């Protein structure tokens, strides 16, 4: 019987262990940041251990980084975490993309941009959205702090192999509908746990037609479907993206092997989901997890359980309302889901020559210094600033309430991030997940509108 893409990469990295039991995997790349690494480094010190493979360990600063004055960190905990990573990186010989570095940015942007993320690798990071790197045909997954320490010490992890789930996406995306809408729709239809226990391979003509940046958006949110892993078959678009990047020095030696990374025709999946996106609409979340979402023209659903009741109460909304009824106050363009150059380009087309609605606070946070530089070379910063957006420095920013960028209590925010949990963007913040185009249009109109009627 043939193998799936996931099986091929997994089996190549098994050092010991039987099928159906925990197996010891070799880890090719370990990405770290300031939040989940301090205790792991301290664990090495307490046991008088060295970092096993500093050459396979790369660090960046992202979660706590201010996006206005990056060298003036007022929060004591944030400042301590940042200075601790700087100290640890120096002590243990880890390459750190430090504050102000041309390569600094959100960890799941830095990996691909530098060429560290490559097909066929096993990649881990102490962050939930590590599956982003699966868009390159890698097995990439988030780990906890104790596992971070285990990788530090051994460059391995014990893992139990998951089942295989194929999501076959076909049809041409309508104008004004994007990769973000695909993954939001899937989660709204099948729930936040339909991928639990599975590695999801996204396949089909629609996936193959997407840019690498759009593919990363989909894999980024696999965890929101309950899946630890999300991946896609690497192809010529993947190889072109990786080629000539700083850490892709092995490109010529590796590309033939990368071309073998595909699911065999006779491979069997444990579950298959099919989605035709021909008539897909822009998506908007109304509640407090990504499953609580609707197509733009669909009324919010009836209350089915206590979770729905609590979500409506927290969000200040009612069944039967529509996205256009939401009283927005903030718009956030950023995060590891949608802060890449193509995201900012698409949003800039919508806001060019227009003005942010007077009641809206609109913020653009490029996901990395590289994206910021490229965007400014294209004049995107001027387009956004002329329209009334704030143009910030790179970082995780308003995706999570761990830095100064937070949504005020009770305020609704159109956000291009990946999570809309209670308090995710600040105490009492009300988050609505949308595509960059939807967020940009909302900033101008002061409310959600059907972006299909707005896109250039």
UniProtKB/Swiss-Prot annotation:
Source domain of life: Bacteria
Keywords recorded for this protein, A-Z: 4Fe-4S, Amino-acid biosynthesis, Branched-chain amino acid biosynthesis, Iron, Iron-sulfur, Leucine biosynthesis, Lyase, Metal-binding
Pathway info: Amino-acid biosynthesis; L-leucine biosynthesis; L-leucine from 3-methyl-2-oxobutanoate: step 2/4
Pfam families registered for this protein in UniProt: Aconitase
Enzyme class: lyase
InterPro entries: 3-IsopropMal_deHydase_lsu, Acnase/IPM_dHydase_lsu_aba_1/3, Acoase/IPM_deHydtase_lsu_aba, Aconitase_4Fe-4S_BS, Aconitase_4Fe-4S_dom, IPM_dehydratase_rel_enz, IPMI_cat
Note on cofactor: Binds 1 [4Fe-4S] cluster per subunit.
EC numbers on record: 4.2.1.33
Gene Ontology biological process terms, A to Z: L-leucine biosynthetic process
Keyword set includes Transferase: no
Cited function: Catalyzes the isomerization between 2-isopropylmalate and 3-isopropylmalate, via the formation of 2-isopropylmaleate.
Family according to the record: Belongs to the aconitase/IPM isomerase family. LeuC type 1 subfamily.
Name assigned to this protein: 3-isopropylmalate dehydratase large subunit
The organism of origin for this protein: Staphylococcus haemolyticus (strain JCSC1435)
Organism ancestry: Bacteria, Bacillati, Bacillota, Bacilli, Bacillales
């Amino acid at each position: 019987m043939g193998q799936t893409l996931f099986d091929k990469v997994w089996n190549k990295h098994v050092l010991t262990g039987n099928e159906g039991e925990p197996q010891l995997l070799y880890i090719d790349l370990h990405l770290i940041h300031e939040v989940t690494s301090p205790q792991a480094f301290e664990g090495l010190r307490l046991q008088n251990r060295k970092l096993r493979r500093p050459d396979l360990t790369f660090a960046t600063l992202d979660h706590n980084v201010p996006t206005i004055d990056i060298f003036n960190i007022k929060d004591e905990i944030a400042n301590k975490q940042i200075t601790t990573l700087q100290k640890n990186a120096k002590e243990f010989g880890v390459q750190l993309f430090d504050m102000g570095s041309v390569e600094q940015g959100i960890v799941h942007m830095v990996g691909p941009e530098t060429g560290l993320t490559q097909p066929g690798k096993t990649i881990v990071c102490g962050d939930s959205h590590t599956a982003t790197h699966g868009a390159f045909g890698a097995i990439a997954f988030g780990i906890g702090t104790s596992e971070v320490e285990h990788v530090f010490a051994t460059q391995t992890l014990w893992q139990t192999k998951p089942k295989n789930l194929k999501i076959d996406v076909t049809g041409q995306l309508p104008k004004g509908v994007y990769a973000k809408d695909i993954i939001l729709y899937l989660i709204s239809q099948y729930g936040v746990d339909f991928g639990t226990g599975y590695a999801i391979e996204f396949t089909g003509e629609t996936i193959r037609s997407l840019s690498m940046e759009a593919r990363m958006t989909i894999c980024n949110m696999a965890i929101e479907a309950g899946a630890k892993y999300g991946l896609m078959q690497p192809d010529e678009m993947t190889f072109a993206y990786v080629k000539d990047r700083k850490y892709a020095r092995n490109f010529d030696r590796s590309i033939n092997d990368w071309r073998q990374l595909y699911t065999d025709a006779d491979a069997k999946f444990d579950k298959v989901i099919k989605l035709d996106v021909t008539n897909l609409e822009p998506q908007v979340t109304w509640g407090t997890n990504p499953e609580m979402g609707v197509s733009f023209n669909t009324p919010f659903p009836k209350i089915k359980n206590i979770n729905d009741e609590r979500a409506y109460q927290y969000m200040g909304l009612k069944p039967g309302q529509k996205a256009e009824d939401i009283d927005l106050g903030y718009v956030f363009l950023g995060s590891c889901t949608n802060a890449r150059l193509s995201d900012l380009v698409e949003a800039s087309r919508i806001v060019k020559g227009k003005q942010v609605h007077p009641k809206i606070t609109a913020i653009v946070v490029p996901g990395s210094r590289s994206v910021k530089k490229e965007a400014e070379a294209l004049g995107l910063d001027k387009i956004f600033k002329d329209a009334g957006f704030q143009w910030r420095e790179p970082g995780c920013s308003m995706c999570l309430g761990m830095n100064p960028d937070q949504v005020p209590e009770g305020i609704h925010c159109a956000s291009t991030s990946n999570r809309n949990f209670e308090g995710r963007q600040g105490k009492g913040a009300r988050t609505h997940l949308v595509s960059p185009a939807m967020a940009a249009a909302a900033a101008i109109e002061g409310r959600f509108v059907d972006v299909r009627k707005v896109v250039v």
